[in-house]
């Protein structure tokens, strides 16, 4: 047998039979290896050394060996490079017993042998021994593995992945690996390769036992928390058996901040609180675990209930729910206006983003509980590995749990930009002020205690600055106290920003300094460990100050004290509130037509009721539970982003072209772009030249010639026409008006005109009040009065006429005009400038010579939103939200 032969690993080739002389240590190794091949002795534990099971995890030595290795590390004793008195056989036996230092020495020995002979075989064996040592957290073995990986020595397709994984481990992960090894063998005293989860749970109590055994007296609460945490850690895997590698991987995920969700599903005191409760009082997840038979019976009853409801499915096939849904949808969409969107969209954005803020804050509270459990597990690991870098572990945890904070800040962005635009009449500012104050306090209490001096001072500074800023708007007459909140000097900083010198400004500067100090902790790693979590408290506090400015004293009393007292007075107030509610509803119904309301509600509720019947699996409890999941927040943020981008594109399109208030007269336009210019050159050249006038807002005077209706839109009529004939006539009379009867008493011109159509109409009633009209007005140039009062032929040229498009809001004034009326109108030059009969949009109109009884004398102006000033106000509010009272937008 070859004297250089190593124990064969699964990926190593057979050694060549070429003996060579070696040193005395190698002869000792040869003898031990020959004995190993012939007898195959196994050391205590699941693994003896490299061989058929070389890829398995190595078991550590007995507890006495653990203390021996600790003393060797402390005293610097044990096998070293210069210590040649210890025979290699003894080192090999230690390596087989699981000593990581001996395994490293054996790996180094075979690396030296690989330099002389059988390089591939010895290198492969050395890597196998080094892998075993690296799995126990041996730093020297990791360095040698990195060198082997770089030189491709002993690296095969079977071990390359494992070598890369061990070589890339950080010091923190190696420390966690060491602690996990000790904990695993305490949980597995029989040194099995795989242990059942139930057996591990039975041995959890042994982890907290010291060398002298269990300590007398009650178990400290910290040890109880560590024991519960360890039980959750063991039961976090779905496997029935857990091996050493599985346990180590769980702890490595912990080191990276990826904590199993089962660790934080419930509080530490849940088991004590749920003791003695009946199955009906337990949550669903605990009911399934603790009382499975009772849960199965409930599921059976639920399935029977679903089966009974499924019989209603045939009803949905008879009633055309999709058609009804489509009719309602198109009726709603066709009646939507820009005014409605300008009112509704900011409210939707505000409420959705505020709900998203609340959900993200609840997720942050959940993470604060995770922080507490995280530190409990850290303390447990520190008992077995004092070299564990706790700060680095906390940094990893904080970095991997920044998602709810990012979602929260994005939600704050939407709240800030939508609040100044949204209608305050539809926002309960007093109630929201109380809610924001509550979340300010609770978010502060959930912060880490490591930065407590800075967070406490920051919150006190922020609250003081906010209260001082509120003093000038207080209704009380405290002139000396209000001076503290007033601005003494304003210094312009550029054209857009103003620097305010005041007491709140100085406090704000100090607050920024505290932010910097929090971020500076742990070499600026405190930015996402301490500063970002505190921003949740900061944003809630700033939002409460802003909403307080829109609140009233009575509303704050109602929101803070009234609702609290309402809980105690609930039995007495129920009857009174019910009576008041009935009276209010009766008053509301008497002011409206009850039949019309009932029919509308019934039609709209049919699809909803059928959908509820067919979707019996809908769970309100599940919906409430899902609010703490990030998927709901992501969905809200995606929709908010889409809505804001859509509105932004609309505003950008409508405000992109600046309107120029031109002094251009109609006569000048006619000379440049009228028939005279066409005759001098041609119409196409004239159109190209006149395109330079695009965007001019002009106010001209002209002669009204005629107006015509170009389009009539009635979505209600379209929807009713799709219904059966008798239902359609009934709904026309319900929602519309009946044709009047022709009688000598009809004095109204409109009634007289309608009564003539009664015999010709195919329905007894009409719903023309829902009509939306689009008009086109033809306007000619005004006549110039000559000396003899004659009009030139050129002035009455119809090719100089222009056409104005008008919406339904100009209906009243347009129907009162007569041919030849002198009108003043405003429009914007755009479109087919320089052609015959250019078409412009009517912006404003007034009649100059109409009789007062036919048309009001006021000017009819098209209602248009000033989107530019709206966006400017939102941006100014957002800037002041973040920087006031230090800076404010000009």
From Swiss-Prot:
The modification N-acetylmethionine is found at residue 1. The chain crosses the membrane at residues 314-334, 340-360, 402-422, 427-447, 465-485, 496-516, 529-549, 563-583, 589-609, 632-652, 870-890. Changing residue 779 to M: In DFNA6; benign. The modification Phosphoserine is found at residues 32, 157. Changing residue 885 to L: In WFS1; mild form. Residues 10-20 have a biased composition (Pro residues). The modification Phosphothreonine is found at residue 30. Highly expressed in heart followed by brain, placenta, lung and pancreas. Weakly expressed in liver, kidney and skeletal muscle. Also expressed in islet and beta-cell insulinoma cell line. Keywords: Acetylation, Cataract, Cytoplasmic vesicle, Deafness, Diabetes insipidus, Diabetes mellitus, Disease variant, Endoplasmic reticulum, Glycoprotein, Membrane, Non-syndromic deafness, Phosphoprotein, Transmembrane, Transmembrane helix. The keyword Transmembrane applies. GO terms for molecular function: ATPase binding; calcium-dependent protein binding; calmodulin binding; DNA-binding transcription factor binding; proteasome binding; protein carrier chaperone; ubiquitin protein ligase binding. It is a multi-pass membrane protein. It holds the Pfam family WCOB. Residues 653-869 are lumenal. Its main location: endoplasmic reticulum. Glycans are attached at residues 661, 746. It is found in: Endoplasmic reticulum membrane; Cytoplasmic vesicle, Secretory vesicle. GO terms for cellular component: dendrite; endoplasmic reticulum; endoplasmic reticulum lumen; endoplasmic reticulum membrane; secretory granule; synaptic vesicle membrane. It comes from the Eukaryota. Residues 1-321 are annotated as: Interaction with ATP6V1A. GO terms for biological process: calcium ion homeostasis; endoplasmic reticulum calcium ion homeostasis; endoplasmic reticulum unfolded protein response; ER overload response; ERAD pathway; glucose homeostasis; kidney development; negative regulation of apoptotic process. Interacts with ATP6V1A. This is Wolframin. It comes from Homo sapiens (Human). The lineage of its organism: Eukaryota, Metazoa, Chordata, Craniata, Vertebrata.
């Amino acid at each position: 047998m070859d004297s250089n032969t190593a124990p064969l690993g699964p990926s190593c080739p057979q050694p060549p039979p070429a003996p060579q002389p070696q040193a005395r240590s190698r002869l000792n190794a040869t003898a031990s290896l020959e004995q190993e091949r012939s007898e195959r002795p196994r050391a205590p534990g699941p693994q003896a050394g490299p061989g058929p099971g070389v890829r398995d995890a190595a078991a550590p030595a007995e507890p006495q060996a653990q203390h021996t290795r600790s003393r060797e590390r402390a005293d610097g004793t044990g096998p070293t490079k210069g210590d040649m008195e210890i025979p290699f056989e003894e080192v090999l036996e230690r390596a087989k017993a699981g000593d990581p230092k001996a395994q490293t020495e054996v790996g180094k020995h075979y690396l030296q042998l690989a330099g002389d002979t059988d390089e591939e075989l010895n290198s492969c064996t050395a890597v196998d021994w080094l892998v075993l040592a690296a799995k126990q957290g041996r730093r020297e073995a990791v360095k040698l593995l990195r060198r082997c990986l770089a030189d491709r020595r002993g690296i095969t397709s079977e071990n390359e992945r494992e070598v890369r994984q061990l070589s890339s481990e950080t010091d923190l992960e190696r420390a966690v690996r060491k602690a996990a090894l000790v904990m695993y063998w305490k949980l597995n005293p029989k040194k099995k390769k795989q242990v059942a989860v139930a057996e591990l749970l039975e041995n959890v109590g042994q982890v907290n036992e010291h060398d002298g055994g269990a300590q007398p007296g009650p178990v400290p609460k910290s040890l109880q928390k560590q024991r519960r945490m360890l039980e959750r850690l063991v039961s976090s895997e779905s496997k029935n058996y857990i091996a050493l590698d599985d346990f180590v991987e769980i702890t490595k995920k912990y080191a990276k901040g990826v904590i199993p969700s089962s660790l934080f599903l419930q509080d530490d005191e849940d088991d004590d609180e749920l003791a003695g409760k009946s199955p009906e009082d337990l949550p669903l997840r605990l009911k399934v675990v603790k009382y499975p038979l009772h849960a199965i019976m409930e599921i059976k009853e639920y399935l029977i209930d679903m089966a009974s409801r499924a019989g209603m499915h045939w009803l949905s096939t008879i009633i055309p729910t999709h058609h009804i849904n489509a009719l309602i949808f198109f009726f709603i969409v066709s009646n939507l206006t820009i005014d409605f969107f300008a009112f509704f969209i900011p409210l939707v954005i505000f409420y959705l983003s505020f709900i998203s803020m609340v959900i993200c804050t609840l997720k942050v509270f959940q993470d604060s509980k995770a922080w507490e459990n995280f530190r409990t597990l850290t303390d447990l690991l520190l008992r077995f590995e004092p070299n564990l870098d706790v700060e680095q572990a906390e940094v990893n945890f904080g970095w991997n749990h920044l998602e709810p904070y990012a979602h929260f800040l994005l939600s704050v962005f939407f709240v800030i930009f939508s609040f100044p635009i949204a209608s305050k009449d539809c926002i309960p500012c007093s109630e929201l002020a109380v809610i924001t104050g509550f979340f300010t306090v609770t978010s502060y209490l959930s912060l880490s205690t490591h930065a407590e001096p800075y967070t406490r001072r920051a919150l006190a500074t922020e609250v003081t600055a906010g209260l001082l800023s509120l003093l000038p708007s207080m209704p009380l007459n405290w002139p000396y106290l209000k001076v503290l909140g007033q601005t003494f000097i304003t210094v312009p900083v550029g054209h857009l920003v103003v620097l305010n010198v005041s007491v709140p400004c100085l406090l704000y500067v100090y607050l920024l300094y505290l932010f910097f100090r929090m971020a500076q902790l742990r070499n600026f790693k405190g930015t996402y460990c301490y500063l970002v979590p505190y921003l949740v408290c900061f944003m809630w506090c700033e939002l409460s100050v802003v909403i307080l400015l829109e609140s009233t004293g009575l509303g704050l009393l109602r929101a803070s004290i009234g609702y609290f007292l309402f809980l105690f007075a609930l039995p007495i107030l129920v009857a009174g509130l019910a009576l008041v509610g009935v009276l209010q509803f009766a008053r509301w119904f008497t002011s409206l037509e009850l039949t019309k309301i009932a029919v509308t509600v019934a039609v709209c509720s049919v699809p909803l009721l059928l959908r509820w019947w067919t979707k019996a699996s809908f769970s309100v409890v599940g919906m409430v539970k899902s609010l703490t999941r990030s998927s709901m927040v992501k969905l809200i943020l995606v929709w908010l982003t889409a809505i804001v981008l859509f509105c932004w594109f609309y505003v950008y399109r409508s405000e992109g072209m600046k309107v120029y208030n031109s002094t251009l007269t109609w006569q000048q336009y006619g000379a440049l772009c009228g028939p005279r210019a066409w005759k001098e050159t041609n119409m196409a050249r004239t159109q190209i030249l006149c395109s330079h006038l695009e965007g001019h807002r002009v106010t001209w005077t002209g002669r009204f010639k005629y107006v015509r209706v170009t389009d009539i839109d009635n979505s209600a009529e379209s929807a009713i026409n799709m219904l059966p004939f008798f239902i359609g006539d009934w709904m026309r009379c319900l929602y519309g008006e009946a044709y009047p009867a022709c009688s000598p008493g009809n004095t109204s011109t409109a009634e007289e005109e309608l009564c003539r159509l009664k015999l010709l109409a195919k329905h007894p009633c009409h719903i023309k009040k829902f009509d939306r009209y689009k008009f086109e007005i033809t306007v000619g140039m005004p006549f110039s009065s000559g000396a003899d009062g004659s009009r030139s032929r050129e002035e009455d040229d119809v090719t100089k006429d222009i056409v104005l498009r008008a919406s339904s809001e100009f209906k009243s004034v347009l129907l009162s005009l007569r041919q030849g009326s002198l009108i003043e109108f405003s429009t914007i030059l755009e479109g087919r400038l320089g052609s015959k009969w250019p078409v412009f949009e009517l912006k404003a109109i007034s009649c100059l010579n109409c009789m007062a009884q036919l048309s009001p004398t006021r000017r009819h102006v098209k209602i248009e939103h000033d989107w530019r000033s709206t966006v400017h106000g939102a941006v100014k509010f957002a800037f002041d939200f973040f920087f006031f009272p230090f800076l404010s937008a000009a």
